Amino acid sequence: MTATGAPDVGDVADQDAAAQAAVLRGLPSQAQLWHWIERLNGFGPRLTGSPAHAAAIDFLAAELQALGLQVQRDHLPLRRWTAHATHLALDDGSAIAVAAPLPYSGVTPADGLAGELVWFDGRPRSFRKARGKIAVVALRRRDLDRTLLTLAFKRKARLPDGDADVASPITTPLLTGLQAVALDKARRHGVRAVICVFEGVSEAQLHGQVLPFITPYRDLPAVWVSARHAEALRAAAAQRRQARLTLHATLQDTTTDTLYAVLPGRVQDETLIVNTHTDGPNACEENGAAGVLALAHAFAALPRAARRRTLVFVLVTGHFQLPQIGVHGRQATSAWLQQHPQLWDGRGSHARAVAGITIEHLGCTEWRDDLAAGAPAPTGKLERDLVYTATPALDALYRQACAGRSKLRALTLSPRLEVAMLGEGQPLYQAGIPVVATCPIPDYLCQVLPEGGIARLDPAYAQQQVETFARLLARLDQRDAAQIGRIPLTPGRLLSRLIERLR
């Protein structure tokens, strides 16, 4: 203790070391973490509200209950769209391979629907010329380049070196896939169906992409096809020929569950939130729940007296159907925050969340699309971990928690606009909760893959990521709220709030 009464730097370091050691003793092994990841992946694609997703949620609930935690469920209504089969052919019978349907687009009659093809170069301002016809829209891949990254984010630490930064564009189907085509506009203009031709992406990379996942049901069938079919479709449209599209899908009213569990600490008026989502198409998207289980194990192993604050573990549903689950289309955790203010907003007798940790997409290795080869291939690198650190103190604490790692490739950043923040850490940030959120974006993030693409994950990398968050959470529990800090009120945050009020 210093003469002013503040903790001595050496005392803080000793307390951190002791707290971290205690937590790491209770942290499950790499083998156990990998077992959980394999179990989740073993359910198959866990798209929102599907039987596989429900089974995975039940499994996670049982694992938390086995720790002695009381698991609560929020039952959320969902109108679930499920695609069963697709087929596309020109009027001469030549088949056009469908890479994937656009989620929640629409459904055709059993024998499909036929219409004249109308070609559009890029996203059209108007679909009027395709009224009563099938629109074919060519979309060029948009990458996350350094300019876009600078406009959207403030880049901070590069760990362990400059290779974690973005020297060349991050090639990804995600940005173009999320934007896709304005199906609502096309439907208003009387379009019968839409074919999206994705340029700059190999057919193997495009196959099974679940994009976009941020749009509601549009009642307009739409599919992705690869660029190898572009010339055939363009030529057919120029000759005013027809095609027949079949998209067999069902709509079902059901429910889907968010889980949360509270682990009490010495004080009840301050909480730390650890969250992720449970729905996704493959082994990496979403395996964050395995990391949440690991942290729950580590902290539940401590005596209550060793936990300063109450921990709240939140596993939300709805990330892959944000229009139905998220509040005003925000990320799915926004629904949980809205329903449980007593655990975070600090008003009246409510507890205040002094910090949050969001874990997503553990253990990803880097694969990049090779158009010449016609398929993506591994680069031999770890996937760049994009880690949002909401305050300077959190950035420093995260960097300290990474010390000693042999598998590390992380770029820390903060969003200039709240909407630019990817992943389920966004609602915490929007609510003013200081958060550290990991959200790497591998090319295969939203892709249904054979065996879930689990071979693309590195178990040791996943374990070291979780160990980092265990150290970080232990340090956060030792810090006063003032030491963690508040999210700076930047011009970008003010603009985000103004936009939100105008919605």
Regions found by a protein language model. Name each.
Residues 19-27, 42-51, 115, 119, ...:
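Second-shell loop/turn segments in exported
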